[in-house]
Amino acid sequence: MVRVKNSVTAHSRHKKILKRATGYYGARSRTYRVAYQAIIKAGQYAYRDRKQKKRIFRQLWISHINAVARQYGLSYNNLINNLYKSSIYINRKMLAELATSDQVAFLNLVNNIKIHSK
């Protein structure tokens, strides 16, 4: 019976893990066992934060829209409600971009909404 040795496989697997852990502090970048745990945890954080990123950006867009809408005498919820009532379908990302970078277009949008809401 031939004896199976895993030293080459184990060494390459350890090297792969340690390569992914470069830049980590202390033993996390030098010791396989600690580096493996750090990489697993980093992956969990990355997965969680990819989901949170979408929520955070939506909150940011809404706060930008609300801040500019209040300058023109509308609250955020009135603005969105009247947009849908007047059949203007624009997502919050584009609306926030209009509100921050192109004030004239946003003002035209608000005036259009005010006309249709009466």
Swiss-Prot record:
PROSITE patterns: RIBOSOMAL_L20. Signal peptide: none annotated. It holds the Pfam family Ribosomal_L20. GO terms for cellular component: ribonucleoprotein complex; ribosome. GO terms for molecular function: rRNA binding; structural constituent of ribosome. One of its GO terms (biological process) is translation. InterPro entries: Ribosomal_bL20, RIBOSOMAL_L20_CS, Ribosomal_protein_bL20_C. Keywords: Ribonucleoprotein, Ribosomal protein, RNA-binding, rRNA-binding. Belongs to the bacterial ribosomal protein bL20 family. Binds directly to 23S ribosomal RNA and is necessary for the in vitro assembly process of the 50S ribosomal subunit. It is not involved in the protein synthesizing functions of that subunit. This is Large ribosomal subunit protein bL20. It comes from Blochmanniella floridana.
